[in-house]
Amino acid sequence: MKRLHWKCYIPRLCQALNEDDPDRRVEFCEWYLAKCADDVKFAHKIVWSDEATFKLNGVIVWCGISALGIIGPFFFNETVNGESYLNLFQEFIGPQITEMFGEDSDIYFQQNGAPPHYHRDLRAPLDAVFPNTWIGRRGPIEYPARSPDLTPMDFFLWGYLKDNVYANKPRTIDALKLEIERQCRDIPNDMFRDVCESLGARYQRCLDNNGHQFEHSQT
């Protein structure tokens, strides 16, 4: 961890798992590790995504990250719903990912199971941009519910960003947005690469713990 020069942000409170969640987590980790065994660059082919709320008056931010860097931030002016997320995907997320990786790249796109990500009108655009390669609720690849410890958005990006954004004490919404944008720009790309390349070891720890939460046992 010291060699990589980045800090792992471990949630203080574990999200309780349902009875069948460990099995779903095992399935996902096994799928990921099998893909990595077949393709040594597979860790570089996933875009991880999520929203987070930054507090002043509650700024909702979407970002995506991959081993190549960050996409976003994009700001929502109100609570995220299916329509606003669909618009963001069509106008920004899909085009930005295509710009980053190229038209013909075999790229995977991950999103969690939040209700806006499950909007009935979103599936067709997802299938069009990422045919059989999007990861999420009822997608071609299921992302396990209640698993923030398996996505670098939660175990890395949001904690890192909030620490750095709040350290500069922005006092207005506009100042907060500018600081979020600046901090996103300032994250070096090799940090994203290192975080994404660390996922294999993290997922192996999950398997070693039979799909149960494992961060409390990290050394």
Where are these regions (language model features)?
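Surface/interface recognition patches
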Residues: 1-219
